[in-house]
Regions:
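N-terminal pre-domain/capping segments
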Residues: 6, 20-134, 282, 286-300
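Histidine-acidic metal/acid-base catalytic patches
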Residues: 2, 22-63, 185-206, 210-300
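Sec-dependent signal peptide recognition
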Residues: 2-8
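Bacterial N-terminal signal peptides
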Residues: 8-16
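Active-site acidic/histidine proton-transfer and metal-coordination neighborhood
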Residues: 87, 94, 105-203, 278
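Catalytic-core regions built around general acid/base machinery
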Residues: 81-90, 157-165, 221, 250-254
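Active-site-proximal loop/turn and secondary-structure-junction residues that shape catalytic pockets
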Residues: 35-37, 69-71, 101-104, 142-144, ...
Length: 300
């Protein structure tokens, strides 16, 4: 653990020096903290490494983060919301979004009654409101939903969660992987969800990598369902912009059509030649900061 802390501190110093000398254009840019799970994924690692990691991210140019460590009882990364907000404030960051999972069980689906799930969400929303979070996002769906009737129940569930979020000044969203672009009973799973959720209460956090991996065009979805994608995941599996497979220029050039207000970088793994997740984060940040098609801000 001591070696990890020393290594992080050394890397953070390098990023701090580079940011002072290069002074890239400031852009509103988020990062999913799941990307750094090897450094801060557990509560213990977060407590040990948070100061150095959060400062390093801010020095790279990130302005906000998305969480992925809610315990279901009001704590994020093992901390009370007030403490986590203080940690982020000290680094010059804010938390705009969080990924939390609370699936329905077989009884909920059979009865189409999910009222027993809503107190959990009320606790979740209250905790994240203390952090100033804008978006609460369900990161995935069960992979074994057999019928559109089950998907419809989830859509109604999401509408209900979205109403709770809206009452507290937040937005509820759903994050896709590739499986949502498959068909159930002849209907594309993802399309059905968009068409059967209320745009007042539910947005869709398009993960552009997973969409591309499924063989669909994010931009075509922006055109088909304008305004439904308020926050998107900017991902290239490894460092953003390095594979040449994902058309980030077209994605960002159509951000207004999509309804994008915020975007969040996510890195699934580090390239072998890079070898360090913080360096992967820096390469991704530099790509977006220097890209002429990425605006300084998408918020109104």
């Amino acid at each position: 653990m001591k070696k990890i802390i020393i290594a992080i501190a050394s890397i953070a110093f390098v990023f701090s020096f580079a940011s002072c000398s290069q002074k890239p254009a400031k852009k509103e840019m988020g990062i999913q903290l799941y990307s750094l799970r090897t450094l801060i994924g557990s509560d213990e690692d977060f407590a040990a490494n948070k100061t150095e990691v959060l400062k390093a991210l801010a020095d790279m140019g990130y302005t906000c983060v998305e969480a992925a460590n809610y315990d279901g009882e009001g704590h994020i990364y093992g901390e009370e919301p007030e403490q986590l907000k203080a940690d982020l404030d000290a680094a010059g960051l804010k938390m705009i979004s969080t990924h939390v999972n609370h699936w329905l069980d077989d009884e909920n689906l059979a009865s189409k009654d999910f009222s027993n799930r809503m107190d959990w969400w009320k606790t979740c929303i209250a905790a994240h409101k203390k952090l100033g979070v804008k978006y609460i996002v369900m990161p995935s769906m069960p992979g074994d939903l057999p019928t559109l009737a089950d998907v419809k129940t989830y859509c109604e569930y999401y509408n209900a969660i979205g109403k709770l979020c809206a009452d507290q000044g937040m937005k509820f969203g759903f994050h896709n992987h590739s499986g949502e672009f498959e068909k159930i009973e002849g209907k594309v799973f993802y399309d059905y969800m968009i068409e059967n959720t209320d745009p007042r209460y539910v947005f869709f956090q398009m993960d552009v990598y997973w969409a591309d991996n499924a063989g669909v065009s994010p931009v075509e979805y922006f055109k088909r369902y304008p305004g439904r994608f308020e926050c998107i995941h900017v991902k290239d599996w490894r460092e953003v912009g390095q594979s040449g497979k994902v058309g980030f220029d077209a994605i960002f050039n159509n951000a207004a059509l999509a309804g994008v207000k915020d975007y969040v970088v996510e890195i699934e793994e580090t390239s072998p030649e890079v070898g360090d997740i913080l360096e992967s984060c820096r390469i991704s940040a530099d790509y977006l900061l220097s890209a002429p098609f990425v605006k300084e801000s998408y918020s109104e």
